[in-house]
């Protein structure tokens, strides 16, 4: 039997936002995830969490995050328990503090995917167990681990990589890419209309990390400047969950920021990869896609089907890596 390595040690820690961790800790989690991916590929069992019980709290719907946490828990030997928006009453019938104290008595770790960053912070404060942020309106740290793992798999390194995000600069992906990228020594470029620029508070955190660790942060509405010589182009949906009434406004603002072949040609490179946290509106094979086409005449939104299905696209590697990186976080913070 192959002897598995001890988990990367962040025992007892929570992952609430990227800035909670150092560059070395973030890199350690990525490297540990790469090891765990090899274990799974080769059928090597790695039950670091044998006998543990994990609560999966979801205020927002999810495919990848729920699947990744569920499979990661089982692979690690733990039992996951899903609690959806109809099962939990955070701040409605029961305070976050009281809920946290109850769950902390029953579970060994808690994942939370919802709206409020304060909610996940309070879960960590009052539960007494590791808490992992599966997404809030402010940050998406588990996504970042998968994103930068995917970049490292493709290029072999992270420091000095040029990463361009094109789209709504105010959403959680843009926030997290700026901070995590700057912390990892990546040159992060946020390409967005001026009216969708990220708030100064998030930019300031990212620039502080960049000065500390050697990355850089650029905010621009100039597409050619943003994608020149870039190694990775990243986009996200133009309308986030809860903003569906703003489709027309966002389409008008972002239609020139679609990731397409013309934009890829501006990079001047053949090796540039495409990333997306998914789901993506790249065709009309969804009810949303059909509705957008009927209302606005757009068959593709933030990315064209050509780019989404091209050899540049690493979106399904990226999605798979959610599982491996989440597994790394859980094992590192809770394993033995």
UniProtKB/Swiss-Prot annotation:
Keywords, comma-separated and alphabetical: Arginine metabolism, Cytoplasm, Transferase
Subcellular location: Cytoplasm
GO BP annotations listed: arginine biosynthetic process via ornithine; arginine catabolic process to ornithine; citrulline biosynthetic process; L-arginine biosynthetic process
Enzyme class: transferase
Primary localization: cytoplasm
HAMAP family, per database record: OTCase
Family per record: Belongs to the aspartate/ornithine carbamoyltransferase superfamily. OTCase family.
Protein name: Ornithine carbamoyltransferase, catabolic
Originating organism: Staphylococcus aureus (strain MRSA252)
């Amino acid at each position: 039997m192959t002897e598995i390595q001890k988990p990367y040690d962040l025992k007892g820690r929570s992952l609430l936002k990227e800035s909670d961790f150092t560059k070395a800790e973030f890199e350690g989690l990525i490297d540990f995830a790469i090891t765990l991916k090899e274990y799974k590929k080769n059928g090597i069992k790695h039950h670091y969490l044998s006998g543990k019980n994990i609560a999966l709290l979801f205020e927002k719907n999810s495919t990848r995050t729920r699947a990744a946490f569920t499979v990661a828990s089982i692979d690690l030997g733990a039992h996951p328990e899903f609690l959806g928006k109809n099962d939990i009453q955070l701040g409605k019938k029961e305070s976050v503090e009281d809920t946290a104290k109850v769950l902390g008595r029953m579970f060994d770790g808690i994942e939370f995917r919802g709206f409020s960053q304060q909610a996940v912070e309070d879960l960590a404060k009052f539960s007494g167990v590791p808490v992992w942020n599966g997404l809030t309106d402010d940050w998406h740290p588990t996504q970042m681990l998968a994103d930068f793992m995917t970049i490292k798999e493709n290029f072999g390194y992270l420091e000095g990589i040029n990463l361009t995000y094109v789209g709504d600069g105010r959403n959680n992906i843009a926030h997290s890419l700026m901070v995590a990228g700057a912390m990892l020594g990546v040159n992060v470029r946020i390409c967005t209309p001026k009216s969708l620029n990220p708030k100064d508070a998030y930019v300031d955190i990212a620039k502080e990390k960049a000065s500390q660790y050697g990355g850089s942060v650029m905010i621009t509405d100039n597409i050619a400047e943003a994608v020149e010589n870039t190694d990775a182009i990243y986009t996200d949906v133009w309308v986030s969950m809860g903003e569906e009434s703003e489709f027309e406004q966002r389409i008008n603002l972002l239609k020139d920021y679609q990731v397409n072949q013309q934009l890829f040609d501006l990079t001047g490179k053949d090796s540039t990869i495409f990333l997306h946290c998914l789901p993506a509106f790249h065709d009309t094979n969804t009810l949303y896609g059909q509705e957008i086409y009927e209302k606005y005449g757009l068959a593709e939104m933030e990315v064209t089907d050509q780019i989404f299905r091209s050899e540049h696209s690493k979106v399904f590697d990226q999605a798979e890596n959610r599982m491996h990186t989440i597994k790394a976080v859980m094992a590192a913070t809770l394993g033995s």
